[in-house]
Regions:
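Extracytoplasmic/secreted envelope proteins and their assembly/folding machinery
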Residues: 22-25, 32, 36, 40, ...
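A short, structured surface patch at a secondary-structure boundary
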Residues: 27, 32-79
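Acidic/histidine-rich, surface-exposed loop or edge segments in extracytoplasmic proteins
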Residues: 13-20, 60, 106-109, 126
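Extracytoplasmic substrate-binding proteins
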Residues: 97-171
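Solvent-exposed coil/turn segments that connect beta secondary-structure elements
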Residues: 15-17, 33-34, 44, 51-52, ...
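Solvent-exposed, acidic/flexible segments
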Residues: 29-32, 73, 91-94, 114-121, ...
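Bacterial Sec-exported substrate-binding components of ABC uptake systems
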Residues: 1-33, 136-165
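Binding-cleft/active-site segments that stabilize strongly anionic ligands or cofactors
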Residues: 61-110, 155-171, 175-214
Length: 214
């Protein structure tokens, strides 16, 4: 991701295009809970977000103080048009409607590159720091994050690098995830060894059966 300055405007080149954002935008809409978590940690207020399936630790955003802008999969375009946001932050779930969102306000695509998970997360955090003039807070945030990762990796190493298997259960479907996947940080960042080195890399994981688990 490339960030350039034009006066008080940041020009951010991302995977889907270009976002021209005024520094410290006031009306911010977030469609990614990872980005919301980061903004919350940096003390950046947001105007709106999807209020379905909000993680428990971000439950305060269920408050009426925040506008409901639809769901992660189905943005409420009418509400967004009404809000006239200064910045819309999205990730992979909204990729297909990027063009429509970008007509309603500068839209920044902050997806994670699972093949380089940790570095990708840090880059996204630093971009948010640039937008909201929170560079110092970002340095502290990332230092704390790196310390926590190092502490977990030390425990993993001390345990003899144990194996792990990450699965997702959705109705009757069970999917396994390996390195370089959406849950690949368990292996690539925290240092666990995948119990099955042949798990195929897929956005939705590799379909498995109960027999596979046995």
């Amino acid at each position: 991701m490339i960030v350039a300055e034009e006066g008080d405007t940041l020009v951010i080149h991302h995977a889907l295009g270009e976002a021209r954002v005024k520094r410290n935008p006031q009306k911010v809409v977030v469609f990614d809970f990872g980005a919301l978590d980061t903004l919350d940690a940096l003390g950046v207020p947001v105007t709106g977000l999807p209020k379905t399936n909000i993680p428990r630790y971000l439950a305060k955003y269920q408050s009426d103080a925040y506008q409901n802008v639809g769901s992660l999969a189905e943005p409420d375009f009418e509400k967004l048009s009404e809000l006239q946001p200064d910045l819309i932050i999205i990730s992979g779930r909204q990729r297909q409607v990027y063009g429509e969102l970008n007509k309603l306000g500068p839209t920044l695509y902050l997806a994670i590159d699972y093949t380089r998970y940790a570095d990708s997360v840090k880059e996204n955090v630093r971009v948010l720091g640039e937008i909201f003039d929170k560079q110092q807070e970002v340095d502290t945030y990332l230092t704390t994050l790196e310390e926590k990762i190092a502490a977990v990796r030390a425990k993993v190493t001390a345990a003899g690098v144990p194996t792990a298997l990450v699965i997702l259960v959705n109705d009757r479907n069970i999917s396994a995830f390996g390195p370089a996947s959406r849950f690949g940080l368990v292996y690539d960042v925290l240092g666990f060894t995948p119990i099955d080195p042949n798990i195929e890399v897929s956005t939705h994981g590799m379909n498995i059966s109960y027999e596979y688990l046995v």
